[in-house]
Amino acid sequence: MKAIVLTGYGDVDRLEMREVPEPRAAAGELKVRVSASSVNAVDWKIRRGDMKAWMPVEFPHILGRDTSGEVVEVGLQGTGFKVGDRVLGLVRQAYAEYVTAPLDAWALLPPKLDLKDAAALPVVALTGAQLIEEAVRPRRNDLLLVTGALGSVARSAVHAATKLGARVIAGVRKGQVPEAAKLGVESVVALDDPAMVDRIPLLDSIADTVGGETVARLLPRVRRGGTIGSVLGEPSGAKERGLVVRAIQTHADSKRLAALAQAVVAGELVIPIGGRFPLPNAREAHRLAERGGTGKVLLTA
């Protein structure tokens, strides 16, 4: 089969289309013909070598955690799925024509969800939901600020927090305030406006998707004993202020992924698409994703 292979750390020219062995579904796995995968920040950070100190890879290496497609093989002991099912999943080595992964990595695709666009969901939707439900753990009426609120992970976090009855403040940049107001949150604050930050009421918690100085400036706005949930590790100075810090690593969750897909169909959760590229054009896709923005970049079959 064809796959996009990372041949070493570096720029996008280290991504090459190659013939690689086609996988077979082991016991308890599905094999899926990939309709689309997506480019996440972790992909281009791995490619550049930003993460090699704690997430080294062996070359050649196939990137990609998101995928959607059609089941072509069900391994032994594989229940709940059949050949021909349309699925989306949190996998590994998704920049390829076929991919295999355990059953709990997959969810059936709702009929009204576009098969290719579904590849935008698994990593960001699960990360946002797990950030709220497993790290922040807000109670009803807690006042929670989500940083980087127009990002895909943060959009999912806003959705999850709202479902739990939290009062959500969307934290964005000045120029993003009008767009963030459409998220259905209690209020919006420009985190690059010191005057607005100073007016933030006392928070019960922060769901941080940005890190760095942005979250550091917000720590004084959180009540003692409040919670910082993060996808980027522990913010400096948080525990010294008497705050509870919980970081998460995204993990497969079939039931939660299925529910998030239904939320997209219902219009409750919107993950924008920022670009679509054929799989052979992975270099261009990485360039666009690396420039940033608020939309997911897809690689399509």
Could you say what each language-model-derived stretch is?
Residues I169, P178-R246:
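Glycine-rich cofactor phosphate-binding loops and adjacent beta1-alpha1 units
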Residues L121-A190:
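Mid-domain Rossmann-like dinucleotide-binding core that forms the NAD(H)/NADP(H) cofactor-binding site
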Residues L257-A301:
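C-terminal hydrophobic helical "lid"/dimerization subdomain
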Residues S68-V91:
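A glycine-/small-residue-rich N-terminal strand-loop-strand element
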